[in-house]
Amino acid sequence: MSNFTAEDKAAITSLWAKVNVEDAGGETLGRLLVVYPWTQRFFDSFGSLSSPSAIMGNPKVKAHGAKVLTSLGEAIKNLDDLKGTFGQLSELHCDKLHVDPENFRLLGNVLVTVLAVLHGKEFTPEVQASWQKMVAGVASALGSRYH
């Protein structure tokens, strides 16, 4: 079941077609780690996360951010089945990594901020509303194993 209207889907897919996964992914994960420093504990293997510049310049942060957004691209192709799309990732993050599901919501909100910065006037309030709905749905799907 989907809560996404045809307009939501169009707004999401239209903007997504213009997103550079490497740039936006690195920026999103980097900002998450800077703004919410407690999230750094999940990335001990990434090397130096000692300052904002170290985080934003860290190649492992950029690579993992791109991986996260690549996964999000799969969700965008399957907006009507976010829970199914993220079933295995939910299990991994819950059972093995023990990630607080609140972090998924935070990451989604940071992504919306990054998209607004990168896409300026094109990121209208209507586009933002559709993206907020999508990142909330993704956060819920990723947290579904916890429920």
UniProtKB/Swiss-Prot annotation:
Gene Ontology annotations for the cellular component aspect, listed alphabetically: blood microparticle; haptoglobin-hemoglobin complex; hemoglobin complex
Keyword Lyase assigned: no
UniProt domain Globin: residue ranges: 3-147
Residues that coordinate or bind heme b: H64, H93
Keywords: Heme, Iron, Metal-binding, Oxygen transport, Transport
Superkingdom of origin organism: Eukaryota
One BP term from GO: hydrogen peroxide catabolic process
Tissue distribution of the protein: Red blood cells.
Gene3D superfamilies per UniProt: Globins
InterPro entries: Globin, Globin-like_sf, Globin/Proto, Hemoglobin_b, Hemoglobin_oxygen_transport
CDD domains found in the cross-reference section: Hb-beta-like
Transport recorded as keyword: yes
Annotated GO MF terms: haptoglobin binding; heme binding; hemoglobin alpha binding; metal ion binding; organic acid binding; oxygen binding; oxygen carrier activity; peroxidase activity
Subunit annotation: Heterotetramer of two alpha chains and two gamma chains in fetal hemoglobin (Hb F).
Role this protein plays: Gamma chains make up the fetal hemoglobin F, in combination with alpha chains.
Family note: Belongs to the globin family.
Protein name (database record): Hemoglobin subunit gamma
Organism: Aotus azarae (Azara's night monkey)
